[in-house]
Amino acid sequence: MKILYAASEATPFAKSGGLADVAGSLPKALVKDGVDARVIMPLYGDLKYREDLEYVTNYSVPVGWRSQYCGLFKAEVNGVTYYFLDNEYYFKRRGLYGFYDDGERFAFFSRAVLETLFYIDFTPDIINCNDWQTALVPVYLNLYYRHLDKFNRIKTIFTIHNIAYQGKYGTDILEDTCGIGRRDQHIVEYDGCANFMKGAFETADKITTVSPTYAQEILDPWFSYGLDALLREKQYKPVSYTHLRAHETLRHL
């Protein structure tokens, strides 16, 4: 079993909230259980232990109508391989989020996660994406990579840590920045906006949450932050990490 855990933050390298704790602990637990679990995340400007990273290679990543540089670094901590995606324009800043171009930054990161698989000796059975920052990974996988032999058997899990943050932007971002043509924009559009998380709901093979309580909470209109209609429409039944076993999950995908 091979799992690539895509996250915008992970301990011990970068943290702004609980996502980093899960991204730092779950892959480690899976490795102890015999799973080849690896983590991929941005190489932020204030990333801890930057001096210990090993340079691997660099390549170009499509971002809308243009291409952007991506450097690949790696490190191993507690038996887990971490990959770091470098682009100084997007990530060499103080802090992780809250910038005017966050949509472009994480559209780049989501596309770069998939492009990276061409340059490493690792093809995951599952890509586990987390929150809106990686929500375009399953969208891009289905639109642009699924026909390739390396990608056609990869399954995706999307984990909701905080449904309040969905990656909502004007629809003009979709073609120019995200590279999603008009024919496919309905996948990511919701309620007059581009909504990255909605795109993951439409394209991921399985949806999980971080606890049984939260899995039930987000089915309530009061706690769904506008996504309750979509959840009802898709008869959405999220499962929690408490109930998630990697081997069982792959068997049912």
Describe the residue ranges of each PLM region.
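Acceptor-binding helix/loop patch of EC 2.4 sugar-transfer enzymes
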Residues: 90-101, 150-194, 212-219, 225, ...
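Segments forming glycine/polar-rich beta-alpha architectures that bind adenosine-containing cofactors
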Residues: 229-234
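An aromatic- and histidine-rich active-site surface loop
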Residues: 102, 108-109, 127-146, 154-174, ...
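Conserved small/polar residues in nucleotide/adenosyl-binding loops
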Residues: 242-252
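N-terminal subdomain of nucleotide-sugar transferases
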Residues: 1-74, 206, 211, 215-216
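Short secondary-structure boundary/capping segments
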Residues: 19-22, 47, 53-57, 100, ...
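Conserved nucleotide-sugar donor-binding subdomain of glycosyltransferases
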Residues: 77-132, 176-199
